[in-house]
Amino acid sequence: MDTTNRKGMEKLYLKRLFILLFLFPASLWAQDALSETPVRSTDTEAINEIVTGLNTVWMLLAAMLVFFMQPGFALVEAGFIRTKNTANVLMKNLIDFMFGSILFWFIGFGLMFGVGVFVGTPHFFNLDIMDKVIDNGLPIEGFLIFQTVFCATAATIVSGAMAERTKFSMYLVYTIFISVLIYPVSGHWTWGGGWLMNGEENSFMTNIFGTTFHDFAGSTVVHSVGGWIALVGAAVLGPRIGKYGKDGRSKAIPGHSLTLACLGVFILWFGWFGFNPGSQLAAATGTDQTVISHVFLTTNLAACAGGFFALTASWIKYGKPSLSLTLNGVLAGLVGVTAGCDLVSPFGAVMIGAICGIVMIFSVDFIDHILKIDDPVGASSVHGVCGCLDRKS
């Protein structure tokens, strides 16, 4: 009985071996046939869809980080002013994003990316004008959101410089002007095909001065524009009551919470990792990833150097380190490196941050004591002056 079973099992194994030997070469042939199949157009389209999807997600993620800078600005401004005016400042920061977003979508976006040398032809509700700008397949609506948060950043810079003495109704008027005219025109000149034409060889700058204008993420377009508007606004409004004595000397009006201000700077620092690296607008290729990583590094180094050298300069100048000036030094370094963060070396980023941190200290002193312009948060020095220091030509 055992012999019979053994023979039966041997026959079964032989049958299985025969089947495997017969089918195995066929599977190899089938694999060879598959490997020789050419890549179809549908495969290329699928790859392009993945690339576009990654780029879109990166752009929208960066937009969310920049949007998160709004509470950062609100906390910095609230911390640097007196308690009684906190609600007013917070309301202004809220309204300039809400109101400004609608205005920029309705008018500003068309002015910024329309056709023209000095100003774009407006296209109300017509997002098709972006076909000539978006050359990597990014959705137009997504790019609109990305530019909207940049516009909101330019608008909210002014709020702090004019704090504690601006009527809410007049602030609404200002929001209209910067959202539908000032920022769109500034952006059109540089990023929308205007006369500066960011980095283009045949631009007005090249033809007249023999060099190109480079502003990667908005050191001039966003921060410098907002900073100079802040300076003019503060000068027109005049100082707060009690800021200057009868002899003309400046009197300190301390803010009510450096804790809020410090938290706000950390939030802004975090949001800047969307502001600068996000301006690459793509993250799918190796080149994009290299640029993004480099911009992350230069942005962080400039912030650290700006804060450190502002701390050192304030310590030497006033005999003790100043937290408020150190916080503004961090922001000064971030603003300064924004234009050329994609081009400068890490050492160059440290130098830019150091210069901006030191210049900011003396700029605040000059505006306060010499020009006698009352800027409670130092916005004109941080954004206006330092925004001019790193424009790449």
Give residue spans per PLM region.
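N-terminal secretory signal peptides that target proteins for export/translocation
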Residues: 1-12
